[in-house]
From Swiss-Prot:
Organism expressing this protein natively: Actinobacillus pleuropneumoniae serotype 7 (strain AP76)
UniProt entry keywords in alphabetical sequence: Cytoplasm, Methyltransferase, RNA-binding, rRNA processing, S-adenosyl-L-methionine, Transferase
Record InterPro entries: KsgA/Erm, rRNA_Ade_diMease-like_C, rRNA_Ade_Mease_Trfase_CS, rRNA_Ade_methylase_Trfase_N, rRNA_adenine_dimethylase, SAM-dependent_MTases_sf
Protein name: Ribosomal RNA small subunit methyltransferase A
Gene Ontology MF term list: 16S rRNA (adenine(1518)-N(6)/adenine(1519)-N(6))-dimethyltransferase activity; RNA binding
């Protein structure tokens, strides 16, 4: 086994069930921290600090930093880190189940202030974790995440492209999305089998296309993109009649990727006002996109 693919880094063995790949390329680390641009006095939260590749250089620039770490061994290492321990608040918990709203509200943020979230996210939880965080968009200033490059392409996609999908719409509904930099597998130990990229998500201060209930935005995008090869006349036939779609200015021959976020918001708001008599999807919409 080559050193690059070794699962052991700085004395810690990467755990597959936690999706651990440890960042070690100093140039990449410098570029990510520069993009985050942490300042003293800001509320900074890192998800999945791991062995501290981002934690250490960020903590050099600030006095306080909160981290959420599920791996008990890594949390213990951070508690005994000679430089970090007095600066860190360590939350040893699964970020997917953590009540971020309760924590954010405990910070007593001032008007216009928000939490700055960042992390090298385990790729096996990155999408559901972002969906979890979108629920607290009103309390977040920005987010910087290392993700699979393919996921970043989907986050940043425009209509009429193959990458455009439900993830695109839900992310851009809540946030302005900007790619920051691409990262090769060699920047990690063990090296992942895919390319990575860093993305910046900045929650809109005012939602550009607000919906009355985000459930219906989830609902209509799930149904449309689960059948993305079908025309919308057919894909959405259990939710809308052809006449209703036309009244909402939807081309019956369009496909899911042809509609804008504004189009989907219009459909979602119509469904809120005119819900189907039977909605057998209510319990099965999830975040597997």
């Amino acid at each position: 086994m080559s050193n690059q693919n070794s699962k052991k880094h700085l004395g810690h063995t990467a755990r597959k069930r936690f999706g651990q790949n440890f960042l070690h390329d100093m140039n990449v680390i410098h570029n990510i921290v520069s993009a985050i641009n942490p300042k003293n006095g800001q509320f900074l939260l890192e998800i999945g600090p791991g062995l501290g590749a981002l934690t250490e250089p960020v903590a050099e620039q600030v006095d306080k930093l909160t981290v959420v770490e599920l791996d008990r061994d890594l949390a213990e290492r951070l508690r005994h880190h000679p430089f970090l321990n007095h600066k860190l608040t360590i939350i040893e918990q699964d970020a997917l189940r953590f009540n971020f709203r309760e924590y954010f509200e405990s910070l007593e943020l001032r008007e216009g202030e928000g939490v700055r979230v960042f992390g090298n996210l385990p790729y096996n939880i990155s999408t559901p974790l972002m969906f979890h965080l979108f629920k607290f968009h009103d309390l977040i200033q920005d987010m910087h995440f290392m993700l699979q490059k393919e996921v970043v392409k989907r986050l940043c996609a425009a209509p009429n492209s193959k990458a455009y999908g439900r993830l695109t719409i839900m992310a851009q509904y809540y946030c302005q999305v900007m790619p920051v930099l691409e990262v090769p597998p060699t920047a990690f130990k063990p090296a992942p089998k895919v390319d990575s990229a860093v993305v910046r998500l900045m929650p809109h201060k005012v939602l550009p296309h607000p919906v009355k209930d985000v459930y219906w935005l989830n609902r209509v995008t799930t149904q449309a993109f689960n059948q993305r090869r079908k025309t919308l006349r057919n894909a959405l036939s259990t939710l809308f009649s052809p006449e209703q779609l036309e009244a909402l200015s939807i081309d019956l021959n369009a496909r899911a990727e042809n509609l804008s976020i504004a189009d989907y918001a219009r459909l979602a708001n119509w469904l809120y006002d005119n819900p189907p008599a039977v909605d057998n999807q209510k319990e099965i919409i999830d975040e597997d996109i």
